């Protein structure tokens, strides 16, 4: 599948130059589709690739309103997570997500480690013991992940954080399923909403984290956490809902 051209250049050019490892991770047709352990494994590997490719861009964003280390830290964490994948026993999707979450907590510095660690740990808790994830399972997992991130970071919409990409992604996904969309189409709509939420952070004044210290000067800059969150939601859609 060819990835749509992204709105921002990264370290190695436009985001559109990256393509996922698989064109279609779905089993089955129509609404009744699911993704399995191997598909989740590919998702994690694909996200690690994206973060590695966009490391410098994420760090550039963070240099404007943060500690200039978001891309570096996220890349360190995802590379460490890759090293854990081969040691996982195939089958339990939740265990795979949890392994990633625990690794991110222990290896990613700053606020990103606890927040992304919580996100993946909540995905793991919601899918614990499952060998496949269906559309409703992912809705529950995404909802749990967003709630976990909010609880950990005490963030609300328009605080200029990763929540500003994740909440629209969750809401769009749930709305799409409610409209009768397929799993794949719901994932695509989720990614589109996450991108819109990410862009909407640009004019916001930060109310959380290091960026909040800048006050009004934080306006006019895209939030790096919202950007890496959009990249995650986009990678889910690109890997599992390939055209």
Identify the function of each model-found stretch.
Residues 1, 25-243:
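N-terminal loops that bind phosphate or other acidic moieties
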Residues 4-6, 12, 31:
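Alpha-helical and His/Cys-centered functional microenvironments
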Residues 2-5, 21:
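Basic polycationic patches enriched in arginine
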């Amino acid at each position: 599948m060819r990835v749509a051209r992204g709105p921002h250049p990264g370290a190695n050019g436009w985001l559109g130059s990256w393509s996922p490892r698989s064109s279609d991770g779905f089993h089955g047709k129509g609404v009744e589709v699911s993704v399995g352990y191997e598909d989740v494994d590919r998702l994690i590997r694909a996200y690690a690739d994206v973060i590695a490719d966009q490391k410098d861009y994420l760090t550039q964003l963070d240099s404007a309103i943060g500690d200039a280390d978001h891309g570096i830290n996220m890349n360190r964490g995802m590379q460490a997570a890759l090293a854990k994948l081969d040691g996982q026993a195939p089958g339990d999707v939740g265990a795979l997500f949890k392994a990633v979450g625990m690794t991110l907590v222990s290896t990613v510095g700053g606020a990103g480690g606890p927040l992304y660690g919580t996100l993946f740990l909540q995905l793991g808790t919601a899918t614990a013991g499952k060998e496949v994830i269906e559309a409703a399972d992912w809705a529950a997992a995404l909802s749990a992940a967003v709630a976990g991130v909010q609880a950990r970071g005490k963030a609300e919409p328009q605080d200029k954080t990763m929540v500003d990409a994740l909440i629209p992604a969750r809401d769009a996904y749930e709305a799409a399923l409610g409209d009768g969309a397929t799993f794949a189409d719901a994932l695509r709509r989720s990614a589109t909403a996450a991108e819109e939420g990410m862009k909407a952070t640009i004019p916001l004044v930060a109310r959380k984290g290091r960026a909040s210290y800048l006050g009004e000067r934080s306006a006019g800059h895209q939030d790096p956490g919202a950007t890496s969150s959009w990249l995650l939601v986009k990678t889910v859609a690109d890997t599992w809902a390939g055209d």
